[in-house]
Curated annotation (Swiss-Prot):
The encoding gene: mhisS
PANTHER family: HISTIDINE--TRNA LIGASE, MITOCHONDRIAL-RELATED (PTHR43707:SF1), HISTIDYL-TRNA SYNTHETASE (PTHR43707)
Cellular compartment(s): Mitochondrion matrix
Reactions accelerated catalytically: tRNA(His) + L-histidine + ATP = L-histidyl-tRNA(His) + AMP + diphosphate + H(+)
GO molecular function, one term: ATP binding
Principal EC category: ligase
Main localisation: mitochondrion
Key words of the record: Aminoacyl-tRNA synthetase, ATP-binding, Ligase, Mitochondrion, Nucleotide-binding, Protein biosynthesis, Transit peptide
Species this protein is from: Dictyostelium discoideum (Social amoeba)
A biological process from GO: histidyl-tRNA aminoacylation
Phylogenetic classification of the source organism: Eukaryota, Amoebozoa, Evosea, Eumycetozoa, Dictyostelia
Name the UniProt record assigns to this protein: Probable histidine--tRNA ligase, mitochondrial
Keyword Mitochondrion: yes
Entry EC no(s): 6.1.1.21
UniProt cross-references to InterPro entries, sorted A to Z: aa-tRNA-synth_II, aa-tRNA-synth_II/BPL/LPL, Anticodon-bd, Anticodon-bd_dom_sf, His-tRNA-ligase, HisRS-like_core, HisRS/HisZ
Assigned protein family: Belongs to the class-II aminoacyl-tRNA synthetase family.
Length: 501
């Protein structure tokens, strides 16, 4: 690659017209359109005006997480991490960028995600690939975890079963709305290598445990569950549905007519179009297409839920939106039990039936993506969207972030001592901060004013006290003050239940 200075020099020397130069054959481009020197001069003169018109707003469907929002997200992730590790799961992390074909094969080329919601682009980094291969921003986490396992499966035959959890951003080109963004965050779990019905029960139990530990009442949620059966059962049901929808094609929405033409009738059951919802009430039940073995398996899952006292509702229309699901599928939905506040009731009715967590079994997905060590690799998992979960949390019960300890002085001669004390406190595990680095130019009242809404305590260094190796500690909540020896600061903070970082 040419050095930047040589590149610019070459462009200027040759006065290239309408040139677009690819940098590293990747995403970054340098372009110029130099018709004559007058145009260049005009462009230079207009630089200031152009800068005034620059719009650097967030990209639609994305948002910034400031400290309070981070606090809420961190709470959800921390609860999820704690629950996952109590069930023996370990954290895994996969790239945000993945091959497009990974999701085309796993999620399904006829799915809404692949057809309408993927952020995909050409990968020019592989010069041997012609035409360039397609890569994408991941729309969900399961396929990436399976891909990672396949990549290292030559030394790991997944015995015993593997348990992973993950968290991070996902991307879908959807219409942004409350609780749904184009960049969103998920927490998910995957149990890979066990096909016993009790593994389904454990995964669902884990999901319910997660919801409860977030502080969401059981009475406000509904577990919906269904079985799609195995691959043969799904083929039989898909043909049954196809006949039903062909007989009622005039009642389908335009988008579902296209789904029918593509041959995936199951997607119509997942439609949110009003006319499709009405027609789906009359659709054949998948239970009639299940083999005896699939029915027995599903009944064993339900018995396991009964054993653990987990309430559920069998929803025969539940199919989930991804092609890789087999056998058990489930969702945890928010239901409206608030009959007191009319405004809250109206808002909750709009969110009635909104899924805050969903998952299911995806036996054979790994084999579909290249896993060779078992005929069918059994797997099951779930994922929860964090942005949607936030809507239903009682944020007053979420722990506050650690409040730092403030350091202030009454005399400029103590500024170096304050700086050193702040550093020592941090090394001892305390969160601490100065009101300003320019302590010499601020009186005590200005310093305390800056600390008003954050630190729980402020340590004040004053000449008379400091000469006796003591400091003043001010409680910013009740304004009381104490004089404490320097070597007793740690004990004082611990006794007052100040949290370490």
């Amino acid at each position: 690659m040419l050095k930047t200075s040589n590149l610019i020099s070459s462009l200027l020397h040759n006065n290239l017209k309408n040139t677009s130069i690819l940098r590293n054959k990747s995403i970054f481009y340098y372009s110029t359109n130099s018709n004559n020197n007058n145009n260049n001069n005009n462009n230079n003169n207009n630089n200031n005006n152009n800068n005034k018109n620059i719009n650097l707003q967030n990209i639609k469907g994305t948002y910034d997480l400031f400290p309070n929002e981070q606090r809420i997200h961190k709470f959800i992730f921390d609860v999820g991490r704690g629950v996952a590790e109590r069930y023996g799961f370990k954290e895994i992390s996969t790239p945000i960028i993945e091959p497009f074909e990974l999701f085309n094969r796993s999620v399904g080329e006829s799915s809404d995600i692949v057809m309408k919601e993927m952020f995909k682009f050409k990968d020019y980094s592989n010069e041997s690939s012609s035409p360039p291969s397609m890569i994408c921003l991941r729309p969900e986490g399961t396929a990436g975890v399976i891909r990672a396992i396949i990549n290292q499966s030559s030394t790991n035959h997944l015995t015993p079963a593997q348990r992973y959890y993950y968290q991070g951003p996902m991307f879908r080109y959807e219409r942004p709305q409350r609780g749904r963004q184009r960049q969103f965050h998920q927490l998910g779990v995957e149990l890979i290598g066990d096909q016993h019905p009790r593994s389904d029960v454990e995964i669902i139990d884990m999901a319910m445990n997660f919801i409860e530990r977030l502080g969401i009442n059981k009475s406000d949620t509904l577990l919906k569950i269904n079985s799609l059966g195995d691959t043969d059962s799904i083929k039989v049901y898909n043909e049954t549905l196809k006949r039903f929808y062909n007989d009622n094609v005039n009642k389908l929405s335009p988008i579902s007519i296209k789904r029918l033409e593509r041959g995936n009738s199951l997607r119509i059951l997942d439609s949110k179009e009003r006319q499709d919802i009405e027609l789906n009430k009359l659709a054949p039940s998948i239970q009639d297409s299940l083999s005896i073995q699939c029915k027995d398996r599903f009944n064993n899952v339900l018995k396991g839920l009964d054993c653990l006292g987990i309430s559920y509702e069998i929803d025969k229309s539940l199919v989930r939106g991804l092609d890789y699901y087999r056998h058990t599928i489930f969702e945890i939905q928010i239901i409206d039990n608030n009959q007191n506040n009319k405004g809250q009731r109206q808002q909750q009715q709009q969110q009635q039936g909104l899924a805050i967590l969903g998952g299911g079994r995806y036996d054979g997905l790994a084999n579909q993506l290249g896993y060779k060590y078992k005929e069918i690799l059994p797997s099951i998992g779930w994922a929860s969207g964090i942005e949607r979960m936030v809507l239903f949390l009682d944020q007053s019960k979420i722990p506050n972030s650690i409040r730092p300890i403030g350091i202030a002085i009454t005399d400029s001669s103590l500024s170096e001592n304050a700086f050193k004390l702040c550093s020592n406190l941090r090394r001892n595990g305390w969160s601490s901060t100065l009101s300003t680095f320019n302590l010499e130019d601020e009186n005590l009242s200005k310093q305390l004013k800056k600390f008003k809404n954050n630190p729980s305590f402020v340590i004040i260094l004053a000449p008379s006290e400091y000469s006796n190796n003591t400091v003043i500690i001010k409680n910013m909540d009740d304004t009381t003050q104490s004089i404490i020896p320097l070597n007793e600061i740690d004990n004082f903070l611990e006794n007052n239940k100040v949290l370490k970082n």
